[in-house]
Each structure stands twice: as structure tokens, then as C-alpha cells.
UniProtKB/Swiss-Prot annotation:
It comes from the Eukaryota. The modification Phosphoserine is found at residue 161. Residues 236-247 have a biased composition (Polar residues). The keyword Lyase does not apply. Residues 1-31 form the signal peptide. This is Lung adenoma susceptibility protein 2 homolog. Its main location: secreted. The keyword Secreted applies. GO terms for cellular component: extracellular region.
Amino acid sequence: MAKSKTKHRLCSRESSVSSLLASCSLSDSNSSNSDGSYHYKDKLYRSASQALQAYIDDFDLSQMYPGTSTGKINIDEDFTNMSQFCNYIYKPNNAFENLDHKKHSNFISCRRQTINDIDSMSLTTDDLLRLPADGSFSYTYVGPSHRTNKKNKKCHGRLGSSDVEKNPNFQGPSTPVGDKIELLILKAKRNLEQCTEELPKSMKKDDSPCSLDKLEAERSWENIPVTFKSPIPVNSDDSPQQTSRAKSATGVLEDFLNNDNQSCTLSGGKHHGPVEALKQMLFNLQAVQERFNQNKATEPKEEIKQVSEDDFSKLQLKERQF
């Protein structure tokens, strides 16, 4: 019953480690240990994943039944593999150097530097079992030769970029990616130079007409010439009423023309569309009609005043005669 329960628990999603081990194939050539073997509770396992799976089963049983206990996985293999694994991790591309015990102890007093955190490493099951129980790693430091190599690489990279700009056929000690970047930069510069040379001369000149002027010239339907009739001269023999009416009419026309010129200057000389032009003409005509009506209303009052003054003068003359 206990075994069936553990199998059911292994298949469930409650145990994340067991589900990961069940879903991932850990028995490939990289994670398997062909040279050594693994002992767990008097049983021999060929791969570390099988031994770890048995340990997980016992751990699940110990969580369900307190009487059961887990054992210890023993590795029948020399410790040289562990040192090879450490060298493989801490010497990528031969960039780091190992020191003997005296140099190592002297450097620890000055500075300690680890390469990567344990959680950020990608380790297989065999590597995890080879790690020490306390999880400690040996300290390494960046050697002076590595620093000088970096400086030399930077200097070579700078010289390569300057030489490529001067001479396109120059081949410096740079990486293929750097060569591609330099070639792309040179191509972009050449394309820009060709584009500037192919620009039309009319666009470079300062005397070229503006685009707004060209558009206004093309929109000839808006530039309709407006003609105004010249005012009719008024004879001096006419009555004062006719002269006052003519003066009011000419004044209204002058005001209309002045308002039109002001609106053109305020709008910046821009031509309006046909609908807007019609609206403005209607508004101006309404304003002219209102002013004309006001002048008509004021004219009879002036005539009445003139008649009353004439009558009063006539009455005074009659009284003097009598």
C-alpha cells in the first residue's frame, strides 16, 4: 500500500522535484556516469538519476511515515573527477589561473572573487552529487595576464576601426562580428554621401520658390479678380438730400473695402475656400444693409430739423414786417 501511495504521489503535481525528474530525461550521455557506480541502501545504481529517484521515494515515505528514514548515496569514484569538474567550471576559455596554496592564502587576505553563483550554474545530476556537502567552492582570481589581454584586445579593436575608416582594404586583428559592423558603417556613410550628391540643385539654392507659393499658384480657382465700379461723381446742383445719400453710400463702400483689406492682412494673405468666401460676402452685405438702414433713419430727422428752422425763420420775417 505504501508503494502504491508513493507512486501516486510521484505522478501528482505535489512533489515538484519528482515531477521534474519524471518529465526530464536525465539518462543521456552527459549526465550518466559510465565509469563509476552509485550505492544507496545496499543497492547498486548505474546512473545518478536512479539513485536520486530512490532517495526521493524514501524522502516522500519519511514525510508520510515518521518511522522510515533516508540513507546516503555513496559514489565509487576517485576524487580526480571532482577536480576536473571544478577546473571545467572555473576556467572557461583558459581565462582564469589557479594558484598554489601559498599564493591562494595570500590573495584571500586581499580580495576574494567568485565567478558565478551556485543558483546560476547549469549542473547535471552527476555534478550535483560530486559537490561537497557544505556547498563550498574554491576561490579564484583574475590574473594579470588576463587583464593585459583585455587591454590588448581593446587597443587592437580601436586601431582596427581607425584603420578601416582610412583604408577600406585594411584587415586588423578583430572579430568577425566587428568586421561586419565596420563594413555596415562604411556602407551607410557611402550611401549618405551618394544621396547628398544626387540632390537637385534647385532645392539647394536659396532663391527657389517656396512650396506654399507653388500651391497657391496652382489653386487658380481661388484667385478670382474682384472688380469694383468707380463711384459716380455727384453734381453740385443737386439737392442736399441727394448729396447726403451719395456721401453715405460712398462711406459705406469705403468702410466695406477697408474691412476687406484688414481681414486679408489679418489672415496672412491666405486665400479662403469658395464656401468661406461666400459666407464672408454675405456677412459684409448684411453689415452694409444695416448701415444703409441706419443712414436712412437718420436722414428724415435731419430734413425735419431743416424744415423747422426754415419755418421759424419765415415766421420771424413775417413778424418783423408787421
